[in-house]
Amino acid sequence: MSYVIEGTTGAWELVIGLEVHAQVISRSKLFSGAATAFGAEPNSQVSFVDAGFPGMLPVINRECVAQAVRTGLGLAAHINLVSRFDRKNYFYADLPQGYQISQYEHPIVGAGAIEIELESGETRTIGITRLHLEQDAGKSMHDQHPSKSLIDLNRSGVALMEIVSEPDMRSPEEAGAYLRKLRTILRYLGTCDGNMDEGSMRADVNVSVRKHGEPFRTRCEIKNVNSIRFVMQAIEAEAKRQIEIWEAGGTVDQETRLFEPARGVTRSMRSKEDAHDYRYFPEPDLLPLVLEEEWVESLKATLPELPDAKRARLMRDFGLSRYEASIFVMEQVTADFFETVAAGRDAKLVANWMLGDFFAHLNRTGTSIETSPVTAARLGELLDLITDKTINGKIAKEVLELMFDTGDAAGAIVEARGLKQVTDTGAIDEAIDRVVAANADKLAEYKAGKDKLFGFFVGQVMKAMQGKGNPALVNEALKRKIGEPGA
């Protein structure tokens, strides 16, 4: 069943398109040599070009072009060997030139596609209309002074890739899945870090509603939404607002809006401009951008294994389920961690421990895989202790917690705390004898046919051995000692 919102006049379908602004990973800006490091002192990374000084000419950054091409290739998109930069004219305080250098009619990357997977397991293909390069603007800061707004131009001139989707999404979930998949691809490619909290990936959300089978109605754009969760909330809030207007007999105005997360509503920012309002014309200070086919092919040869291909390989080579492989490939570092641990080991055992206790401790301690005190080598050591029966699974859980809390290796913790599994059959028999003697009534019930009491005896023996008994040996010895139920 497709996603709809029920109004007073029936079901409404959502039509969603996303324009994602992804900051290019590059040491310098798109048209100047100024640095791009996040968090630098305000206005400490600004060249005369970025500040819009008269007579300063832009010089294209080859690496930014290469990053855009890599991204296009990663999106299975058409690379345009000839593209052109244009001036997009508008006034804003943090745009010192009075125009933005962008690409309008002739973008560097054409049509492509992304396949997304929903929680239900259903897959959908979302079309990519285009990717173009453009300059970012500076940043207006309204909370630094009681009566003035301040401008930080560090971001001015930083290279952005604007990745425009087709209006193919029909629910907040699909939009969220699209953004997560796009961010994962960009991170694998190394072309954008995807850190929405730092502003290096931002989304403009286009939303309209219609009855099933109708043509598209008027859309509104929600600007600069900076988290996937907020994108999903903004879509639902804006769709409900538009439905109320249509059902009341009104019309939706094409406009740009902002999302207020605290109130869960969108509010009007300005009337939505059309392309002619920006008076686009070819950038006179830059020649058309002409790429050689051989150069594009050389970039294609450097592409890493992308998420979909990696997932298929993990399923094939390691016997993982689609769900397990999908979790691991969401972040390249997670997939690499898994492969390192799984090399030469039982892959299903590794997957179970990573998806269970290991991820749980990452969440508990607020650490990432990169900063975790439990490295791939150390997790592998712990799993080896389970495999060779030095410790059992219950003890291993305790050891893993101690590894996170102390930073010590598994072997050192097991030795220091005397946690080695007991495999001495004499010690196991002695523990069983004590438990049986203390629970004569339970033994009588077991002998009378209450077979579930076998688990009780196993638990009591393990408790008597402080969890160190080898479970298989305990089960074997217990069956030998107390026999079958009802016997």
Swiss-Prot record:
Q: Which GO terms describe its molecular function?
A: asparaginyl-tRNA synthase (glutamine-hydrolyzing) activity; ATP binding; glutaminyl-tRNA synthase (glutamine-hydrolyzing) activity
Which EC class is this protein assigned? ligase
Q: Which reaction does it catalyse?
A: L-glutamyl-tRNA(Gln) + L-glutamine + ATP + H2O = L-glutaminyl-tRNA(Gln) + L-glutamate + ADP + phosphate + H(+); L-aspartyl-tRNA(Asn) + L-glutamine + ATP + H2O = L-asparaginyl-tRNA(Asn) + L-glutamate + ADP + phosphate + 2 H(+)
Q: Which GO terms describe its biological process?
A: glutaminyl-tRNAGln biosynthesis via transamidation; translation
Which UniProt keywords are listed?
ATP-binding, Ligase, Nucleotide-binding, Protein biosynthesis
Q: Which Gene3D superfamilies match?
A: 1.10.10.410, GatB domain, N-terminal subdomain
Q: What is its EC number?
A: 6.3.5.-
Spell out the subunit comment: Heterotrimer of A, B and C subunits.
* NCBIfam families registered for this protein in UniProt: gatB, PRK05477.1-2, PRK05477.1-4, PRK05477.1-5
Its annotated function is as follows: Allows the formation of correctly charged Asn-tRNA(Asn) or Gln-tRNA(Gln) through the transamidation of misacylated Asp-tRNA(Asn) or Glu-tRNA(Gln) in organisms which lack either or both of asparaginyl-tRNA or glutaminyl-tRNA synthetases. The reaction takes place in the presence of glutamine and ATP through an activated phospho-Asp-tRNA(Asn) or phospho-Glu-tRNA(Gln).
Task: Give the family this protein belongs to, as stated in its UniProt record.
Answer: Belongs to the GatB/GatE family. GatB subfamily.
Name of the protein in its database record:
Aspartyl/glutamyl-tRNA(Asn/Gln) amidotransferase subunit B
Species of origin: Acidiphilium cryptum (strain JF-5)
